[in-house]
Amino acid sequence: MSGDLSLAAGIGYDHAMAHAFIEDKELFPVLAPFAKGRLDRGLHQIYYEQCGRPNGKPVLFIHGGPGAGISPTHRRLFNPDRYHCVLFDQRGSGQSLPHGETAQNTTQDLIADIEVLRQQLGIEQWLLFGGSWGSTLALAYAIAHPERVSGLILRGIFLGTRAEVDWFLHDMGRFFPEAYDQFVSYLTVEERGDILLSYHEKLMDPQALVHQPAAERWASYETSCSTLRAGMRRVTGRSALSMARLEAHYFVNDCFMPNNHILQNIKVIRHLPAHIIQGRHDVICPPVSAHRLADAWGNRATLRMVDDAGHSTFENGIAHALLSALDEFAV
């Protein structure tokens, strides 16, 4: 899950809601990556970029979705004088190829990609920074490779459980009924009996006339529910397809993890420091998951509930909490 798809391209894109988001001047300057590359992973070519200071503290930015991809705005969260920031587009996302591809695209594949990327860049350990699905993948990678992680900054916690997916598909719309009506009205009455499978079938259809409208309904629904202040937002094009198709692909496969895998294995990473930042009014990833994670983690985890925010990285309170956490880890 992400919800940041239409927001990362520009802060305060809607002038009526501008004050709800961090001001442009409060982020770090726009900087070009000092290096770009691709990992050859067989069917998949994984795009990555590096920015900031080459000998700075290594941090890996893990985007949401699955399928949301990275944006130049994401680079602006990281102090270029203190961090060596690595960003990458997960399989099927952003500039990685093939776009929207679901074959050989599992959580285990993504974990392996991260580890290959770390080895290729010669990084011993790195800080993991991920929100929404990015928090899921960060946690799954840390559980698989705890010795390679120096700490975690997590936002909008999604633990990849069936209950959370059911909430997204059936209950989130109680708070954003207009967006939910647009989401389910694309399906026939019969198809609404299993929303996930019905959307998955359409999103996997090779014909653009079938998969693209479904993708835009799905991505627009999620993005419209991403902030405390409501706003109907339309997401179109390639980004809508990768986000919707890959989310449905992962959800129909239980995120390729045993149910409750993360909390059942939290002991593996309990020794690592973590900052967990959660919008109190996040309806995409409700606060109960962040609360459960922090409770299971113990005293090495700090949970900060942001009372005046929803799900988006760039909402004012969340963005400032993320910047503060990055300052602490940079010391």
Where are these regions (language model features)?
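Conserved HGGG/HGGXW glycine-rich cap/lid loop of the alpha/beta-hydrolase fold
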Residues: 40-98
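Conserved acidic catalytic loop of the alpha/beta-hydrolase fold
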Residues: 108-126
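Conserved hydrolase catalytic core segment
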Residues: 124-163
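A catalytic-pocket lid/entrance helix-loop region that shapes and gates access to the active site
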Residues: 149-196
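Short beta-strand/loop motif that positions the catalytic acidic residue
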Residues: 269, 276-278
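Conserved alpha/beta-hydrolase "acid-adjacent" motif
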Residues: 283-289
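Catalytic histidine neighborhood in serine/cysteine hydrolases
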Residues: 297-312
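Catalytic histidine-centered segment of alpha/beta-hydrolase-like enzymes
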Residues: 309-321
